[in-house]
Amino acid sequence: MRAGLPEPPGGARPLLIFPCNGNALEALDCLGSAFRLIGFVDDSPEKLGRTLHGHEVFPRAALADWPDALVLAVPGSPTSFRVRSGLIDGLALDPARFARVVHPSARVSPLASLGRNVLVMAGVVITSNAVIGDHVCILPNTVIHHDVRIGDWTLIGSNATLAGRVTVGPGCYLGSGCSVMNGLTIGAGALIGIGSTVIRPVSPGATVAGNPARPLG
C-alpha cells in the first residue's frame, strides 16, 4: 500500500461519497467497520436533500462543511467514463482526503499496490506485484493477476480477468466479464465491451468488443 494513505486509527473514519450513483450504492456494501458514512455528495438538484438507506444527499458544500471527512469519488459509467477525471479533479480536494475502500472479502496481496481513491468490491482478487493507480474502481469478482498495471481513472467491471503483465492505460473502461490475455497493453481511454476476449493490444481511445475482441466503428 502506498505510504501516506489515511487509515482508521482505532475507529471508523467519517466518509463522504461522490456522486450519488450506482457505484456509490455498490460502495455502501464495501465500507465494513473502517468508515462511518456521513452521506452522499451530488450535483443533481433533484437528488439533493433526499435520503438513501438513511444517508442524506448533500451539495458540494458538504466537502467544506466536513473538512476532516475522507472522500470516495466514484463517478463514471460506460457512457461517461472519459469525463470522470475532470469530475474528480473538479472537486479540488487535497489528495490526502481521498479514501481507499476495500471490501472485507476482497483478497489483495501484500505485494500489490493500491493508489488513492480506489474502490475494490466484494470477491476481487489482486495478486503479487499488481499496481493499481489512483481513482480506480474494480467491481465484484474481478481477478487481476501478477504484474498487472492499471492506470489512473480506470473502471473495471465485474467478473473480469486480467492475466499476468497486462498494462491498462489511464481512463479506460473494461466491461464486465471481459478477459485480457497476458502481456497485452490496453491504450489510454479505451473501452472493452462486456464479455469480450482480448487477444491483441488495444489502441488508445479504441472501442473493442467480441470474441475475439475487434474494433467497433
Regions found by a protein language model. Give the residues of each.
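Structural signal for interior beta-strand "rungs" in well-ordered beta-sheet cores
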Residues: 101-209, 213-216
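Short glycine-/acidic-enriched loop or helix-start segments at secondary-structure transitions
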Residues: 26-28, 82-84, 202
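Hydrophobic, well-ordered beta-alpha structural blocks that scaffold small-molecule cofactor pockets
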Residues: 1-61, 66
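Short alpha-helical
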Residues: 22-23, 79-82, 197
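Small/polar loops that bind or transfer phosphate-bearing groups
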Residues: 19, 75, 182
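Conserved acidic residues
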Residues: 38, 69-70, 116
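Phosphate-bearing ligand-interacting subdomains
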Residues: 45-107
